[in-house]
Amino acid sequence: MDKKEVIEKIEAIVATSVNHHEFTMTEATKQEDVRAWDSLANAMIITAIEQEFGIKFKFMEMSSWKSVGDLANIVLAKVEKL
């Protein structure tokens, strides 16, 4: 699995979680760039990502990412350790 595939899966999870499918996600996309991606949606997104990839985030990891690219890097690092 590469970073592009991870971002595509994250995009699908975000779109479903915020019920908004009219955006294109890139590595530079930030939470505030997506309408309705609030703190409640963020909790749902994190849970869905953990389930999709079979991983668990630590608190510091969840608060450290600033963009989807950062999040994808964390996911990739965790998946590689499985």
Residue ranges and their predicted role:
Residues 2-37, 41-47, 51-82:
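Phosphopantetheine-dependent thiolation modules in NRPS/PKS and related acyl-activating systems
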